[in-house]
Amino acid sequence: MKKKNLLAISSGANINFQKLGFIVERSEIGENREKILSIKIPEIAGSFLKLAKMFANNQITEFNYRKSNSKDAFVLVGVRTKNEKSFIALKQKLKKSGFSFTDFTKNEISNDHLRHMVGGRNNEQLGSNERIFRGEFPEKPGALLSFLENFGSKRHISLFHYRNLGSAFAKILIGIEDQEKDKSLLIKHLDKSGTSFNEETSNKAYKDFLK
């Protein structure tokens, strides 16, 4: 090539898909797009669904819960907000509805560790009545709330883990107290929720760390 003005550009980055996921997750918090809240709820039927309804107009990125022995439990909630003003409005809404909460958005332990550790073993009251299911549903606004509404509040949820990873489908892990003699009734109930599930009660990972 002659009589041409050329510009050489050297570009590159020491990055892979694993690091890219970390960058995306931390940039959501750094740019104030994602907020992390620890919210206290009473351990009574219907309180889990009531909390989910508080976020009907927001995109939930995370929803983690484990039933405890005490009268109250804590739910770790991740939520995307348009701006700081909308986040303030959301906090006011929670307060008016009687929810006590703590903002963990800038808490390093929460961001680096806690969000991956919420869980623990079931309490003695659950015993062998807890059943674990793994499922997924299309990732779209309102999908999580829709599932919880279809599931209802007559059956007690003992464990719940949901994390929005930006894929086409959202994956959830749910623990349910089942005291029915006919164990097929719970399967039929889940089928009506519009979400496909696989039972994981015998999964060794569950037995070793969550049961």
Whereabouts are the PLM-identified features?
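Catalytic phosphate/nucleotide-handling subdomain of diverse soluble enzymes
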Residues: 1-26
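A conserved regulatory-domain signal marking ACT and ACT-like small-molecule sensing domains
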Residues: 17-211
